[in-house]
Amino acid sequence: MQVRTLLTLGKKKVIGNRQCILSLYRKYSNVQSRKAEDQLLRQIFDDQNIAVNQITKRNGIQGVGLFRNHFLSDKDTGFLRLAETASEKCKAVIEDLLLEDTEDGSIVVSKFDRISNLLCSVIDLFEFVRCAHPDKMVVMKAEEAYSYLFELMNTLNTHQGLYEKLKCSLQQTPTLKDTDPEAYTVGRVFLQDFEKSGVNLESSKRNSFVKKSSESATLGRAFFNNSMNRPQRYLTISKQRLAGSDPYFVRSLSKNDKNFIMIPTVGYEGTQALISVANPDVRKEIYMEGHKGTVEEVELLNSYLRSKAEVAKLVGKSSFADLQLIDKMANAPKHVVEFLENLSLKNSSVLKKILNNLALMKKKELNLNFLPSFDVWDREYYTARYKQSLINQKPSLNPSITNYRRFFSVGTVIQGLSRLFSSLYGLRFVPADISPGEVWHPDVNKVNVYNENDHVMGVIYFDLFARTGKTDGAAHFTIRSSRELDLTSFDDSISLGFDDATNIRVKDNKRYQIPVISLLCNFVRSSGMDPTFLDLWDVKTLFHEMGHAMHSILGHTKYQNLAGTRCATDFVELPSIIMEFFMSNPAVLPLYARYEGTEIPLPVQVLNHHNMVENSSAPLDLQSQICMAMVDQLFHSKVVLDPSFNSIDEVTNVTRKFSGFESAPPAAWYLQFSHLYGYSATYYSYIFDTVLASLIFSKLFAGNPLSREAGEKFRKAILRWGGSRSPWECVAEALEQPILATGGEEAMRRIGSEGIKATSTF
């Protein structure tokens, strides 16, 4: 059944489905193309009458398969056949590489990247399908194919023949660093990945490495699952002790009997209790109960930490942090610690003022004649009240009021992002046709990203609304990254079933693979036919993820292994965090915050007031993150191998020194620190990139955040390189501080001492 719609383009009214609308738009666009496509962009996200896509057959055209891959038009066998094809192509390239009598580093690196592209083009697609597809059978098929290729990838990571070929070629081409620096960088990355996998170890050590790595991965998954699924713990409290607490919260609690109430202490519910309960003694009990750990939980974490340290020792590193940071901007654990110490020192004076103000609030509320201690369990309660007092000063400017959400329809925000990127980089979003079978759900929208010469620079699939079975949170997926194409790589794409007739662009007489991105969010779709309206946190999420997308689209490199977001962990968040600074800037506000169906912008006073309220606790939040990053460094140092290591004692020492709460009691809060699994020794990265983003935003965009000149400088210094250039050189160029170009201890110290310059809402 075709969905009929009424769409107004200027003075013309068009009835039809999405495909008809797009076709008529193209005719109409000869007159007012840019204005028409800008309005249509907003409408395809906001007007539910428009058929976002048609999964059924249209005009006799058969389904093209997910992401226009013809293998995937067959849901039953397509995934495995695609995996098998990629495997066969990889093995053929490997055989050819090992037999080829060449030690030319550039040629060898190019073939390594070809292998990597064959694998990543398919396995990244499978990973996305596992996270997003609503059909459980399709997910199962994708998982089966993913496992098939993952096994091959693990085999290649420990392939001694490939390792020796690469190592020898880099040694035999000493001038490669100067003649082809990008090839040299890619080659070094491949070599480091091999050595991190223990391929260069002698046989018995290599076997131990494989075994210990497997054990560590198992322990890590167990710890992560425990940290994310901790059983709720309750306190039974008499109703009298809850006098003065939030009545809505108290009414929501289970009652043991008419005189006692059960209060949850773990996770989100525990945090709500700390926000809502007025009695400081009860808050302390909630905090302590919610941060208890069993002997088994502590031992699981300790075993996990020891296993990682033992893996590092097998490859000649004194700690897991030393192993992890080899290829990061920080380079060494001591540099991370010095950065965090300097940042903590920079934050200390304003932190003391905030804690003193909160202690004064506590004194007043408890009617004391002395300044009481301000404890860790007081933080949530008084921070919430302090923010509410700021909101109450100007209640008409509170953006949580429902009316203000109508300035943030999904279509308006995405239209605003397109307008922002047009100002900064000369890029714009244009709604694209969707062929039958190309997308996985009717909610999905597709846009092409065009430059000012009307060349397609990238493709973005937006999957923004929550649904059952979809992965939680927000995520940016690179389905295919950019890379320079030659005849062999073009043939590879065709062999893998990709429709590359529409996925190639030409620049300087070179052909490049067009990056394909998918953005996942979990916004709650509006009921009925109204547009979906976002709150400011949702808007922040879109801006953040679009920062990653722009990095993927503008990160043009010769080799896919270092394209876009394939860069150092402590550099990759910089482009996304800087987008949060754009969002918080009053000059950018009219681009993305306009009242439903109009061009009337949100009053700038609302944003300024919101920024002021949120930033009122920013130093507290920063100090908490510094403390967690310090614990992350502690847990990945060699101290965990000491037989006398006691995690709770060590964490208590770090907490008292770096949390802002010098008398914090021993507590096992770190058992809920799930990032110890995914961000081992690199949790500092988000803080580090926030500081870098603030410095770069202040340098380039403070005077005019819509400056094309500044946008071009950011693109040329930061975005275009992906991971093919030293990130320190990128930062040094953007900040015009050559002294930073070599990185190292002094550079980390300088960045930490600078602190956060620009302000972000979040």
UniProtKB/Swiss-Prot annotation:
It is an enzyme of class 3 (hydrolase). Binds 1 zinc ion. Its cofactor is Zn(2+). GO terms for biological process: intracellular iron ion homeostasis; peptide metabolic process; protein processing involved in protein targeting to mitochondrion. Signal peptide: none annotated. It catalyses: Release of an N-terminal octapeptide as second stage of processing of some proteins imported into the mitochondrion. Cleaves proteins, imported into the mitochondrion, to their mature size. While most mitochondrial precursor proteins are processed to the mature form in one step by mitochondrial processing peptidase (MPP), the sequential cleavage by MIP of an octapeptide after initial processing by MPP is a required step for a subgroup of nuclear-encoded precursor proteins destined for the matrix or the inner membrane. This is Mitochondrial intermediate peptidase. It comes from Schizosaccharomyces pombe (strain 972 / ATCC 24843).
